[in-house]
Amino acid sequence: MVHAEAFSRPLSRNEVVGLIFRLTIFGAVTYFTIKWMVDAIDPTRKQKVEAQKQAEKLMKQIGVKNVKLSEYEMSIAAHLVDPLNMHVTWSDIAGLDDVITDLKDTVILPIKKKHLFENSRLLQPPKGVLLYGPPGCGKTLIAKATAKEAGCRFINLQPSTLTDKWYGESQKLAAAVFSLAIKLQPSIIFIDEIDSFLRNRSSSDHEATAMMKAQFMSLWDGLDTDHSCQVIVMGATNRPQDLDSAIMRRMPTRFHINQPALKQREAILKLILKNENVDRHVDLLEVAQETDGFSGSDLKEMCRDAALLCVREYVNSTSEESHDEDEIRPVQQQDLHRAIEKMKKSKDAAFQNVLTHVCLD
């Protein structure tokens, strides 16, 4: 039987130390148990930690100091691209001189010479720029070259970054995109294939998706209220007709990046083959005339096929002397012709495949 005096007497020093020790152990076990359970419930926790580490590394690379970022801003910062690490310049883009000139005047100059235009609202850089046109014509290259030339921080935003299984998290991530861009300004938020993210809204849209789009557009509108804000949303698409009309209103500066014409194709070919082993008798104007309807990426792939023909010939050669020389012959006119024919057959086959899937009423 425990006497009442045992409860009323003061605890000895050893008993107090023992009690504190047990409480400490209990608290530590409880903390780590709860932490483990939270991590187990959220399977993306590990990815978030890795994204935070990557974001901190990128922030140091671009020289950003004393800027506090929230957890959501850290998730977006993982998609930052350092302009100094972009190995793309205007000299890497051929056949788009008019577009480049317009971009320099309307986007780059107001950012680089901000002090000249600070008293004019009309001459501020646009808050939205749309690059549209057929695939493979250099839209993404133009966006990167613009960011590098203007010295802007480049946020390569993937639509999947803004999706989260928890209700309300997508809106917080959308808000973090703009709050981060403002903290790092001048900055460009680039959305490739923007039509897949901000396409025409309909009543069949999921509630969470509709709310996230509305939040994104509302924050985008907020950029217009601060005329000194140097944040630009730049999008690229092959299907501008699928974009929501509210998005088109927010992107008043639009550039049509069309398939290259004859002189543009010749300039692109010169750029692609500039540092390659090409026979001096190759007539690039003739090649350009035979590649009507080819995009810039088509021309690059065609030149690669022509160069591979030379490599294949070297590999298949049975002459030991030729292997001893260890040289691959230059690309010749006939190699380019063969590559053109191969590319045309591939494009025709793809077109026929599309036609077979078209439903005829």
Swiss-Prot record:
Its EC number is 7.4.2.-. It catalyses: [protein]-with a C-terminal TM segment(out) + ATP + H2O = [protein]-with a C-terminal TM segment(in) + ADP + phosphate + H(+). This is Outer mitochondrial transmembrane helix translocase. GO terms for molecular function: ATP binding; ATP hydrolysis activity; membrane protein dislocase activity. The modification Phosphoserine is found at S322. Its main location: mitochondrion. The gene is ATAD1. InterPro entries: AAA+_ATPase (IPR003593), AAA_lid_3 (IPR041569), ATPase_AAA_core (IPR003959), ATPase_AAA_CS (IPR003960), Mito_OM_Translocase_MSP1 (IPR051701), P-loop_NTPase (IPR027417). It is linked to Hyperekplexia 4: An autosomal recessive severe neurologic disorder apparent from birth. HKPX4 is characterized by little if any development, hypertonia, early-onset refractory seizures in some patients, and respiratory failure resulting in early death, mostly in the first months of life. Pfam families: AAA (PF00004), AAA_lid_3 (PF17862). It is found in: Mitochondrion outer membrane; Peroxisome membrane; Postsynaptic cell membrane. It comes from Homo sapiens (Human). SMART domains: AAA. ATP binds at G133, P134, P135, G136, C137, G138, K139, T140.
